[in-house]
């Protein structure tokens, strides 16, 4: 869910004009033996490392790195009796601090195996040009000396948007990283997470599930921005618009992880719908966005019951489970910084604010930053929220306390100062600033115009 419309056009241009990519001829995950677990893996504890390997990161961050590793580890889907495996990619900078770990929630926003960070970060940026955003953000943490771990949080089912899956697989990725003895990381290291948009789903659910699923992890803070915290509200907002492709990806992720939803949709979705839902399982985010431009998923050509499929009790039961804040048992026990643009045209602002209020009601410590300038659309806020999120997480890793309870703040920034963190960080901030472009229009109107043309 990460692309506001300005960024969508600029990002492809930047990748080509700056010649950031040198692709390698890598086997895709489904053809790479590393991803296949050894015999007996099902009996291992969650977080157990099954394989490890050194890898080359083929993006701008390679200049920041001492080394990079990948771990195949045991994890689960929605419940403990659904064992599976996935991979996390660990990046270790030259000046690594061994008492801190950053979970970076890459916003892959697609279900195909080749869209996962374990592949795209090795294959090069042009395998998914929107990865430039991810690189710019991760560079900040690496430059500060933090080890970064990036789990493939959707597993083998392409569970995009299925929050309990993403949260569990992220927490097990943290467990595996902390247990890995070749990077010098303290086993009780402080842990923070950073995620925006689709990464906000991952990071938000990691925060929400940590207390019940992985209480031993020493988490100290989570940043989640532009978060689609309510799937029903998300579908209602983007269906039929330029970002309708996220509906296809999200439906596919929910159907693949909720068998009762699959049984229902198999009855009411048309053959064309079944074909449509295969596309996000084989392609990455940019292709999905373009393929489903202005697609109306309520049309009878997709659903024989029209819009009613979304509100069928079996579907609503699943979507309610996937709405952050509805279950008090899944309330973060570690401080959270939420950020959201008031003009977000992808992830509904009101839904994220409801999550904030619910978490606060249930005792969480949450700071909610509203990017209140009218031009603070989804893509713009991806960039403008990055430095505040980084600084807030850095304070947590440095042991600085937060103000307890909940509070709301308004931020009117619409730009990035590439000198804001000093010259050591100018390359990362300059990259993000370049993605924002010289012009900003209300609700990212520039790409909307381009798409209509």
Curated annotation (Swiss-Prot):
Regions crossing the membrane: none
One Gene Ontology cellular component: extracellular region
UniProt keyword Cytoplasm, yes or no: no
Database matches in Pfam families: LIP
Disulfides per UniProt: 115-284, 360-406
Recorded catalytic activity of this chain's protein: a triacylglycerol + H2O = a diacylglycerol + a fatty acid + H(+); a monoacylglycerol + H2O = glycerol + a fatty acid + H(+); a diacylglycerol + H2O = a monoacylglycerol + a fatty acid + H(+)
SUPFAM superfamilies according to UniProt: alpha/beta-Hydrolases
PANTHER family noted in UniProt: LIPASE 5, PTHR34853
Function of the protein: Secreted lipase involved in Dandruff and seborrheic dermatitis (D/SD) probably via lipase-mediated breakdown of sebaceous lipids and release of irritating free fatty acids. Has triacylglycerol lipase activity and is able to hydrolyze triolein, tristearin, trilinolein, tripalmitoylglycerol and trihexadecenoin. Hydrolyzes diacylglycerols such as distearin, dilinolein, dipalmitoylglycerol and dipalmitolein. Mostly converts monoolein to di- and triolein, while free fatty acids are only produced in low amounts.
Name the UniProt record assigns to this protein: Secreted triacylglycerol lipase LIP3
Organism field: Malassezia globosa (strain ATCC MYA-4612 / CBS 7966)
């Amino acid at each position: 869910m990460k692309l506001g419309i300005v960024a969508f056009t600029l990002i492809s241009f930047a990748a080509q004009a700056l010649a950031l990519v040198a692709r390698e001829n890598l086997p895709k995950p489904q053809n790479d033996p590393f991803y296949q677990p050894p015999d007996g893996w099902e009996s291992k504890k969650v977080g157990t490392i099954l394989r490890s390997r050194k890898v080359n990161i083929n993006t701008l961050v390679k200049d920041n790195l001492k080394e990079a590793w990948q771990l195949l580890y045991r994890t689960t889907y929605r419940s403990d009796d659904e064992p599976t495996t996935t991979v996390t990619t660990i990046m270790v900078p030259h000046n690594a601090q061994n008492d801190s770990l950053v979970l970076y929630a890459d916003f892959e926003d697609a279900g195909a195996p080749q869209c996962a960070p374990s592949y795209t970060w090795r294959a090069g940026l042009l395998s998914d040009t929107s990865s430039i955003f991810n690189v710019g953000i991760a560079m900040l943490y690496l430059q500060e000396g933090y080890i970064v771990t990036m789990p493939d949080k959707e597993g083998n089912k392409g569970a995009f948007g299925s929050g309990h899956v993403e949260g569990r697989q992220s927490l097990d990725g943290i467990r595996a990283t902390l247990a890995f003895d070749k990077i010098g990381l303290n086993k009780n290291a402080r842990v923070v997470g950073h995620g925006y948009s689709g990464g906000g789903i991952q990071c938000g659910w990691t925060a929400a599930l940590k207390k019940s699923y992985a209480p031993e992890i020493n988490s100290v803070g989570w940043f989640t921005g532009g978060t689609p915290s309510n799937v029903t509200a998300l579908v209602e907002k983007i269906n039929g618009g330029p970002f309708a492709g996220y509906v296809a990806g999200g439906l596919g992720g929910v159907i693949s992880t909720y068998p009762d939803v699959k049984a229902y949709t198999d009855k009411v979705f048309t053959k064309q719908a079944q074909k449509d839902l295969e596309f996000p399982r084989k392609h990455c985010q940019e292709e999905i966005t373009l393929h489903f431009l202005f697609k109306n998923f309520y049309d009878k050509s997709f659903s024989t019951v029209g819009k009613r499929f979304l509100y069928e009790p079996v579907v609503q039961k699943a979507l309610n489970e996937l709405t952050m804040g509805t279950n008090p048992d899944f309330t973060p026990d570690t401080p959270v910084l939420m950020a959201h643009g008031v003009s977000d045209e992808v992830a509904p602002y009101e839904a994220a604010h409801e999550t904030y209020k619910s978490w606060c009601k249930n005792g969480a410590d949450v700071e909610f930053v509203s990017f209140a300038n009218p031009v603070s659309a989804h893509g713009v806020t991806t960039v403008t929220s990055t430095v505040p999120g980084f600084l807030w997480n850095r304070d947590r890793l440095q042991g600085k306390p937060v103000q307890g309870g909940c509070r709301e703040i308004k931020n009117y920034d619409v730009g990035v100062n590439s000198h804001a963190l000093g010259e050591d960080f100018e390359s990362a901030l300059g990259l993000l600033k370049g993605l924002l472009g010289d012009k900003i229009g209300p609700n990212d109107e520039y790409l909307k115009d381009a798409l209509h043309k």
